[in-house]
UniProtKB/Swiss-Prot annotation:
Domain of life: Viruses
A Pfam family: Ank_4
ANK repeat residue intervals: 1-26, 27-56, 57-86, 88-109
UniProt keyword terms in alphabetical order: ANK repeat, Repeat
Species, as recorded: Acanthamoeba polyphaga mimivirus (APMV)
Disulphides: none
Protein name: Putative ankyrin repeat protein L482
Length: 109
């Protein structure tokens, strides 16, 4: 359930589940990937604080955040070392295909 709840941005429920023993790295860290894809920065930050791997699945979290135009999440993940060049510059390609100019400008700056 943690992955689904993270993707919905319910931070208090995420915290509760983690406190009850939910594994944040289940399914290759998909909780942080889902939160990133949906733009839930507070959840992303919390999961990072719980040692979620931002680079799992070839940096899928930053790639999905880019493709969905979630600039604040992209900035946060990049500042932590996410690789925007993984998968042949997928983050930039995806942001471009989906018309997210602010994300593109940030990624190429």
């Amino acid at each position: 359930y943690l992955t689904e709840i993270s993707g919905k941005g319910h931070i208090e429920i995420v915290k509760c589940l983690v406190n009850l023993g939910a594994n944040i790295t289940t399914n290759n860290n998909y909780a942080i990937i889902q939160a990133s894809e949906k733009g839930h920065l507070e959840v992303v930050k919390y999961l990072v604080g719980q040692n979620a791997n931002i680079r799992s699945e070839n940096n899928l979290a930053v790639r999905l955040a880019s493709g969905n135009g979630h600039l604040e999440v992209v900035e946060y993940l990049v500042n932590l070392g996410a690789d925007i060049r993984s998968e042949n510059n997928y983050a930039i390609q995806s942001a471009s295909q989906n018309g997210h100019l602010e994300v593109i400008e940030y990624l190429v700056a």
